[in-house]
């Protein structure tokens, strides 16, 4: 059994809303593999339900086993119990800055005798 992991951005093209017994849910369809340049192979897409906290524009990672299901003349590929996680991407391209805070609470330096030091 192979696990497929795909990262994609949820947008209007690859996300749709369906009505279920538990209310409206979003489904994302993502390509299961990349098409090679010049290849005539049709790319298979896998679908997975998105958690409610995922919004359009969010980048998500979908990971899980994919199961094929025939529906008439078509074959639908669905993730079975997938793990869907939101990928957090910062909007700035600057280097990561360190938090500047006084770890000692702004206290004054303490005078210590060299005789009291263990070294």
UniProtKB/Swiss-Prot annotation:
Keyword Transmembrane: no
Effect of residue 16 to A: Loss of ssDNA-binding
UniProt keyword Repeat present: no
A molecular function (GO) term: single-stranded DNA binding
Domain of life: Viruses
UniProt effect for mutating residue 25 to A: No effect on ssDNA-binding
Effect of residue 22 to A: No effect on ssDNA-binding
Task of the protein: Binds ssDNA with nanomolar affinity but no sequence specificity.
Family: Belongs to the skunalikevirus SSB protein family.
Subunit structure: Homodimer; two homodimers can further weakly assemble into a homotetramer.
Designated name of the protein: SSB protein
Protein's organism: Lactococcus phage p2 (Lactococcus lactis bacteriophage p2)
């Amino acid at each position: 059994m192979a696990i497929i992991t795909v990262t994609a951005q949820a947008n209007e093209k690859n996300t749709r809303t369906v009505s279920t017994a538990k209310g409206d849910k979003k489904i994302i369809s993502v390509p299961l593999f990349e098409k090679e340049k010049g290849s005539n192979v049709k790319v298979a897409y896998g679908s997975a339900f998105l958690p409610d906290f995922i919004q359009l524009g969010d980048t998500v990672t979908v990971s899980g086993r994919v199961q094929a299901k025939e529906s008439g003349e078509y074959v639908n590929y669905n993730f079975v119990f997938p793990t869907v996680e939101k990928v957090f991407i910062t909007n700035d391209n600057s280097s990561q800055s360190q938090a500047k805070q006084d770890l000692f609470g702004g206290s004054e330096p303490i005078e210590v005798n060299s005789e009291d030091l263990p070294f």
